[in-house]
Amino acid sequence: MRRRSSSLQLAGGSVIVIYAYLVANLTSVVESFEPLIQLPRSGSFRNRPRYERVVNVRNYGAKGDGLSDDTQAFEDAWKIACSLPLRTSIVIPSGYTYLVRPIDFAGPCRSRVTLRICGIVIAPSNPDVWDGLDTQKWLYFHGVNRLTVEGGGTIDGRGQEWWSQSCKINKTNVLLSLLHESPCRHAPTAITFHRCKNLKFKNLMVKNSQQMHIGFTNCVRVIASFLKVFAPPFSPNTDGIHISASTRVEVKDSIIRTGDDCISIVSNSSGIKIRNIVCGPGHGISIGSLGKSNSWAQVHDVRVDGAFLSNTQNGVRVKTWQGGRGFASNIIFQNVRMENVSNPIIINQYYCDSVLPCANQA
């Protein structure tokens, strides 16, 4: 094991300090990751607690024909489940496709809630549905403790129209944005968990998100496992799992193939464990970016143990903006295998994701 440290001293005393452990113990067989392909069966209720109230969205008016708006049925089912004093499951049955507009699942709830997504949940394909709404949200959970989301089903962001409008794809939008005529708009994260504690998110497929697929922000004690996260390699900013300002997050036994970072970990996050991950295509596993706009940033105690990265732009990466302040420390990457990776290990302390050169802030 080698300890590698790097620091950047900037004008005005700004500094980002990075400490990372790079462990070159690479696995030699891809077969060790094959069990990840076989996720638990959809709709399995063998582990259902003995005493549990079941709320079925079909009983609240969800048609599941992929055309009718089922948002109200989902909202009503959530309100009932969240208000009950006993453990409750919301069931989204298999065999149906549910069209759901941007929706908030607000806590706190009176007891434990399990959301079992056994069918297919799809987003509106037209970005205009978000007019007047927060364009960064689609399925948004906030302030919920002891929540489990599982079920073997699929969450489909249908983000193709959003991708075509992205400034990374549509260069005309970049020019118009510079002229303040058509600013580049944010796109939704498919499913966001904000200020949730004791969260379990498992056994689901999340695909074709408008932008990021899964976001954990300001969360504590999270286990994300047995996930499949898929988007085309050309889809812009479609990070698989994005962890921000969260502590004690474990991501394991999952396959992530997207157009951006498979997993990204940004400021004020700590106690992050990542293991048994298949990544690629995509941009690898990233710490950052950190310190944009001269901000303070810190990430510490991150361990990546067991990953196979193939056909990715980067392998394991730490990226910080010039002018930023703070630190990234105790970062460990071990038992990582890479194939056809352009930049296997990269520490970039002058990160810039702008189409135009970034102004010198040092």
Predicted region positions:
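Extracellular/periplasmic carbohydrate-active domains that bind, remodel
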Residues: R2-A362
